[in-house]
Regions:
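Phosphate-binding/switch region of NTP-binding enzymes
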Residues: 79-174
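Arginine residue identity/basic-tract feature
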Residues: 13, 27-29, 57-60, 75, ...
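Conserved inter-motif catalytic segment of the P-loop NTP-binding fold
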Residues: 1-75
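Hydrophobic transmembrane signal anchors and adjacent membrane-proximal interface regions, especially
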Residues: 10, 61, 79, 113, ...
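Low-complexity, flexible helical/coil segments
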Residues: 24-28, 70-79, 128-134, 188-192
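Interfaces that engage single-stranded nucleic acids at replication/repair/recombination sites
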Residues: 1-5, 11, 16-27, 31, ...
Length: 204
């Protein structure tokens, strides 16, 4: 209903397949639309891992598998995400990052929560121009219950909103950064300079 009220046509494809997402991105690259919404990229990542595990007939991934998984994800999604000439808005589930340290009293190593990250391939969450952490808060004082949400800007390429937090955020909170990043956009058919061959730098 939100898009209908705004007069925006929305095409929906319900899928958790990276192959389907890649096909959709190809169509946008050809001009089918200017904006791609992905909800959520965590589902696509989990489906990608499951498909790989089924292909190699394993129930658990092994260390050497990541030497295939990560480059494939980068080639089939992350590189396109960065290079394609349209806008992408995606969300993902939040998960904890864990680290370990030695307990000075017991001498044993203990695992602890060291931060929060998006549940997706490790580098993917840092590719967007803007990264926002959404959190839900609840406060109960007697019979009075307050619920609100906060958006913390983890990364803002424009630097205008970097590090800011908004309570019950709306689109208006993000307009300054969005306007800054949309200034002087490249045309869809902009010429891309080919990258130099770094391999020539190695002496073998």
């Amino acid at each position: 209903p939100i898009f209908t009220e705004a007069g925006i046509e929305v095409l929906v494809r319900e899928s958790k397949s990276l192959a389907d997402l890649k096909e959709t991105m190809t169509r946008l690259r050809q001009g089918a639309s200017d904006i791609l919404l992905i909800d959520s990229i965590s589902h696509v990542w989990e489906g990608f891992l499951q498909s790989y595990a089924e292909k190699v007939r394993r129930t658990r991934l092994e260390f050497q598998d990541w030497g295939v998984i990560k480059p494939t994800w980068k080639r089939e999604f992350s590189d396109l995400f960065v290079q394609d000439p349209y806008h992408i808005i995606m969300n993902g589930r939040a998960g904890y990052e864990y680290d370990n340290e030695k307990n000075a009293d017991t001498g044993k190593r203990e695992i602890f929560k060291s931060g929060i990250k998006m549940k997706v391939e490790g580098e993917t969450a840092y590719e967007p121009d803007m990264l926002v952490l959404m959190e839900r808060f609840e406060e109960v004082l007697g019979d009075d219950k307050k619920i609100w949400r906060e958006a913390t800007v983890i990364k803002d390429r424009s630097t205008i909103l970097d590090g800011k937090t908004f309570k019950n955020p709306s689109f208006e909170n993000f307009v300054p950064a969005i306007d800054a990043m949309l200034e002087n956009p490249l045309p869809r058919d902009a010429f891309a300079m080919p990258e130099g061959d770094t391999g020539l730098l190695f002496r073998t």
